[in-house]
Amino acid sequence: MDYEGIVYRPPSEARSLIIQVTIGCAHNTCGFCNMYKEKKFRIRSLAEILADLTEVSHNPYAPYIEKVFLADGDALVMKTEDLLVILDAIHRLYPGVKRVASYGTAQDILRKSEEELIRLREAGLGIVYVGAESGDNEILKYINKGVTAEQTIEAGQKLKRCGIATSVTLISGLGGRSKVEEHALSCAKLITAMNPEYASFLTLRLYAVSYTHLTLPTIA
């Protein structure tokens, strides 16, 4: 099995089998992010994905795999029926797997019905990692996140109603010096409203290859 480009995963998925079901990120225009800039987004075919799962299942370590992470940036953009086929194959080929995880954007979560999400949970999708970044809509607009804080909250609450755990990440310093208080308070309010199983802050680092030339406002 060959990965396409650099593959990213959450720290807690360090021991997971990583399977690329999509390449890159469908949005891919966040001003702070360079993770998928070298990739043209596409959804991999079921044949490709199932071939990878079958190939790895012959590895002598396969019986010890307990977690699978569906990469790249937003696996939930896939059709639910295709995801169900993938989840079924995972549990058929890797009977020791206890949890399947993926990244998920608020847009993708909201596009799926609760019935679809429940079916995914019943098929083994245990946790979705959601990058909220901030709870302040001005900041979200500035970084070209593509969603509002209210949409992210709604997506998190929807996952909770469907029994899927949520791990939400926010970015420390994203508002710059001039919006330190607004960023901090809005993040706290967002976490409270979402009530995720896990919440963590990441450190901001800017890259020249980001989609926009993001500069943080500072106090004069």
Where are these regions (language model features)?
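Canonical Radical SAM [4Fe-4S] cluster-binding loop centered on the CxxxCxxC motif
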Residues: I6-A51
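Conserved small/polar residues in nucleotide/adenosyl-binding loops
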Residues: T212-T218
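Conserved functional loop/turn residues at catalytic and ligand-binding sites
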Residues: T29, N34, G124, G163, ...
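Alpha-helix N-cap and loop-to-helix initiation/capping positions
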Residues: F41-R44, E48, M78, D82, ...
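Conserved SAM/AdoMet-binding glycine-rich loop
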Residues: H58-R161
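Conserved C-terminal portion of the radical SAM core fold
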Residues: I127, E150-S210
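Residue-level marker for beta-strand->alpha-helix junctions and adjacent short loops that shape enzyme
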Residues: A75, Q107, G135, G173-G175, ...
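Short microdomains enriched in Cys/His and/or Lys/Arg
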Residues: A47-Y61
